[in-house]
A protein has these predicted regions:
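Alpha-helical linker/hinge and terminal dimerization helices associated
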Residues: 1-3, 211
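Central regulatory/effector-binding core of bacterial HTH transcription factors
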Residues: 7-66, 217-219, 225-226
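Short, well-ordered beta-strand segments
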Residues: 11-13, 57, 106, 153, ...
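C-terminal effector-binding regulatory domain of bacterial HTH transcription factors
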Residues: 35, 161-162, 166, 176-226
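Acidic, Gly/Pro-rich loop/turn segments at junctions of secondary structure
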Residues: 41-136
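Short secondary-structure boundary segments
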Residues: 61, 85, 157-158, 175-176
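Alpha-helical segments flanking ligand/cofactor-binding loops in enzyme cores
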Residues: 72, 98, 143-144, 198
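Hydrophobic hinge/microswitch elements
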Residues: 127-171, 178, 217
Length: 226
């Protein structure tokens, strides 16, 4: 039956900034289950899977808008302040969160990442308001802006890791991790779980931790800190 063999259309949705992260998993799943036709939609919002017909939605919002939805935790994500070596040569290296007040802190205009940068300091915290020298709603554009020396970008660790490893960016104020949150796969509850949905979620749970660990290992390597 359809619930035993993975086949048919698998409609996936994830935040725009996670598209590049997930593509190796999409390709790997496609190799395992070639009868499944994958439709991956990227956008800057959290859709309603029931209303919009998505089989699985990747989201950082674990709040279930509907009791007919199930959320499966996939791991934790975080963001880190980064800047290009050229920017730091010109403007100096912030040694403490308070030093960011004198820097061009670029703004993400995207609900998941919007707002102040909050650095916990014991019982207190340092709050930095990004300025309006540049804003974008896509993490990949923020990555390029940071690489080009436009200022300091607060980037998801998986977005920044390759540029950090290759020397195009330096991680600042390590080991601070900002915007730590859990990632979920959300899907409509059914009496039985369709094989393509079940196998995709199992594949995510199996593969994502190692993928996250690889990216985190790079950004947590003190050789790449400033």
């Amino acid at each position: 039956g359809a619930h035993l063999t993975p086949r048919g259309h698998l409609r996936l949705h994830c935040p725009h900034g996670m598209g590049l992260l997930l593509m190796p998993l999409v390709a790997g799943y496609n190799t395992l289950y070639p009868e499944v036709v994958i439709e991956l939609t990227l956008s800057q919002r959290n859709p309603d899977p029931l209303a919009e017909g998505h089989d699985v939605v990747i989201t950082v919002d674990g709040a279930l808008p509907d009791s007919q939805l199930i959320a499966v935790p996939l791991g934790n994500i975080f963001s880190i302040p980064c800047a290009a070596p050229g920017y730091l040569d010109t403007h100096g290296v912030p040694e403490r969160p308070e030093d960011l007040h004198g820097h061009r802190c670029l703004r993400m205009a995207y609900p998941m990442y919007e707002g102040d940068w909050v650095f916990p300091q014991g019982v207190d915290q340092c709050v930095i308001a990004p300025n309006d020298s540049f804003s974008t709603n896509v993490a990949d554009a923020m990555l390029v802006a940071s690489e080009l020396g436009m200022g300091i970008g607060l980037l998801p660790f998986y977005t920044a890791s390759e540029a950090i490893e290759q020397g195009r960016l330096r991680r600042l104020l390590a080991p601070y991790r900002l915007r730590e949150s859990a990632l979920y796969a959300m899907y409509p509850s059914r009496h039985y779980l369709d094989a393509k949905v079940r196998t995709w979620i199992d594949y995510l749970k199996e593969q994502l931790p190692a993928l996250f660990e690889g990216h985190a290992r790079v950004v947590d390597d003190a050789r790449y800190w400033r």
